[in-house]
Amino acid sequence: MGLTLNAEQKNISNIFSGRIKFIIPEYQRPYSWDKEECLELIDDLKQSFKNEEDGYFLGNIVVANSLDENNQLEVIDGQQRLTTLTLLMRVLLYFDSSNIKLRNSIWELDDRTNDIIEPRLFTKVFSNQDQEYFKEVIDLNFDFEALKEPNVNCNLYIKNVYLFYTEIKKIRNNIEIQNFVDYILYKASLLPIQTEGTNKESAREKALRIFETINDRGKSLNDSDIFKAKLYNKALNIKKDQDFILRWDNLNNECIEIKLFIDDIFKLYTHIIRGENGIKSPES
């Protein structure tokens, strides 16, 4: 059976619009973009804006849409990019607080009152307290005035919010900030690759097939990421998903304790399986 998918490049204002919500599932990695990656992103966007370029392409994301949970898109690949964009937009809203379109890109709003209904991006990842940290920094009442340079023990959400905050403060003209916001909303774009399924499991399985061949901002996907997603899907089918997540987290913690990369385990496992099955083609 062929794989049916939808792929259409969209600007940020169209990505985060309507009733669409993005769900980062439990099996995904914790947020990991650091100063270097965030600085590269904001510098590229500012340079593109300064040069008045026609647009700025942010890359691909892979999402699964099931008919039984329509408009709740499970993020298979691109969670780091979507999370970082949301952090950037939250900082920009502090400087451009009356921008309803920007506000609506961070949260779903009531059509009549513009009151916040819920965030457009929600993470179910519980490793490293991702849920709590993310909720804290995108909260409408987050105190930007109290922001201080984070120490080494601060979480990545706070560190990256502070980085974006200091970078935007360098744009001293309010009109220029507003124009920069408009550039991001209407000129920056993503390519969402979306698979459809009658239920969550079938939509996810299709998306995982794409996931195996897509790179995340130029970084090859780890063997462990692919195994984790596939094993999670199997566990979900037999209602063992929470048990799997706990077991995986324990495995990861044990690897950290003995200073072993979890991906090395699955690279070895993949090598063994290929040998047992007589596969001689070069490994990717």
Feature map (PLM): residue ranges:
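Covalent nucleotidyltransferase
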Residues: M1-S284
